[in-house]
Amino acid sequence: MADERIVSAENDDFAEASIEKTLRPQVLAQYIGQDRVKNELAVYIEAAKKREESLDHVLLYGPPGLGKTTLAMVIANELQVQIRTTSGPAIERPGDLVALLNELQPGDVLFIDEIHRLPKMVEELLYSAMEDFYIDIVVGQGPTAHPVHFPLPPFTLIGATTRAGLLSAPLRDRFGIVEHMAYYTEADLMDIVQRSAGVFNMSIVPDGALEIARRSRGTPRIANRLLKRTRDYAQVADQNTIDQAIADHALSQLQVDIRGLDGVDRKILQMMIDYYQGGPVGLKTIAANIGEENETIEEVYEPYLLQIGFLKRTQRGRMVTPAGYAHLGMPYPEK
């Protein structure tokens, strides 16, 4: 169910990934939002270039869809070096990592998405690579097995994760630069929607961009997806410009409400109110009622409801807040 949501921040679609590439900024000056992160990185990058050194290893963490991969590519562009991209699940064996590291030239960037999913053996091999730019691997088996020392050129590892808490302390401590990617403001999302509309050769007025931005859950990936779907409705209606009215119509048809909630989000809140008086309700109970795995509720649905204050966690379980009741047009019960 989660994979089919138009407001999902995950990106598992090849066509969508290809479109995202066309929308990506190339330098920090083009990157919209995340001002604190950008300002800090600009200093670190400029200092590294002046010292003619590789940039310290960078860890980017935060919810999906906020531009961690894009920012990694921007960093490489700013450093004027090549970037090699991979993901934690794709590096199954130490040999896979060795092959990647051997391709690097001095100063290059190695980007590992979902770095929290690296196998333990691969992660341990990274320690010396990150700290001292060498790796030792064992070649051969049995009595003929012997370690081989591989020196590496200085490089920058950029790791991205949606679950920083799953990183081991030894790996986390080897990142000299750690940056948290926050949800975007409506103003930043408006700018992103207007920029993307320009890339798509679409006409959009500010109130149309705002209507899409306010329903995008603070996430650029969702904003761009909603923009594309709104474009479809506008074209079918023979409307050349996306304004507030067509955006509202399109997104209402897609069941994305003014706070970015879809039918599943509202179902969770409504179920908790109707069956459990708003909570507290345990995670397993919510998952069973919705027909999803515990992890899906916790990682896909819950974060945004917590972020906007419609849910809260307690020691006894999840509870719908007064704001959550108000959004559904229901009175908050006196308890």
UniProtKB/Swiss-Prot annotation:
It is found in: Cytoplasm. It catalyses: ATP + H2O = ADP + phosphate + H(+). It holds the Pfam family AAA_lid_4. InterPro entries: AAA+_ATPase, AAA_lid_4, DNA_helicase_Holl-junc_RuvB, P-loop_NTPase, RuvB-like_N, RuvB_C, WH-like_DNA-bd_sf, WH_DNA-bd_sf. Keywords: ATP-binding, Cytoplasm, DNA damage, DNA recombination, DNA repair, DNA-binding, Hydrolase, Nucleotide-binding. Its EC number is 3.6.4.-. Residues 258-335 are annotated as: Head domain (RuvB-H). Residues 185-255 are annotated as: Small ATPAse domain (RuvB-S). Gene3D superfamilies: 1.10.8.60, P-loop containing nucleotide triphosphate hydrolases (3.40.50.300), Winged helix-like DNA-binding domain superfamily/Winged helix DNA-binding domain (1.10.10.10). DNA binds at residues 313, 318. CDD domains: AAA (cd00009). One of its GO terms (biological process) is DNA repair. SMART domains: AAA. SUPFAM superfamilies: P-loop containing nucleoside triphosphate hydrolases, Winged helix' DNA-binding domain. Its main location: cytoplasm. ATP binds at residues 23-24, 65, 68-70, 131-133, 174, 184, 221. Residues 2-184 are annotated as: Large ATPase domain (RuvB-L). One of its GO terms (molecular function) is four-way junction helicase activity. Mg(2+) binds at residue 69. GO terms for cellular component: cytoplasm; Holliday junction resolvase complex. Belongs to the RuvB family. The RuvA-RuvB-RuvC complex processes Holliday junction (HJ) DNA during genetic recombination and DNA repair, while the RuvA-RuvB complex plays an important role in the rescue of blocked DNA replication forks via replication fork reversal (RFR). RuvA specifically binds to HJ cruciform DNA, conferring on it an open structure. The RuvB hexamer acts as an ATP-dependent pump, pulling dsDNA into and through the RuvAB complex. RuvB forms 2 homohexamers on either side of HJ DNA bound by 1 or 2 RuvA tetramers; 4 subunits per hexamer contact DNA at a time. NCBIfam families: PRK00080.1 (NF000868), ruvB (TIGR00635). Has 3 domains, the large (RuvB-L) and small ATPase (RuvB-S) domains and the C-terminal head (RuvB-H) domain. The head domain binds DNA, while the ATPase domains jointly bind ATP, ADP or are empty depending on the state of the subunit in the translocation cycle. During a single DNA translocation step the structure of each domain remains the same, but their relative positions change. Homohexamer. Forms an RuvA(8)-RuvB(12)-Holliday junction (HJ) complex. HJ DNA is sandwiched between 2 RuvA tetramers; dsDNA enters through RuvA and exits via RuvB. An RuvB hexamer assembles on each DNA strand where it exits the tetramer. Each RuvB hexamer is contacted by two RuvA subunits (via domain III) on 2 adjacent RuvB subunits; this complex drives branch migration. In the full resolvosome a probable DNA-RuvA(4)-RuvB(12)-RuvC(2) complex forms which resolves the HJ. This is Holliday junction branch migration complex subunit RuvB.
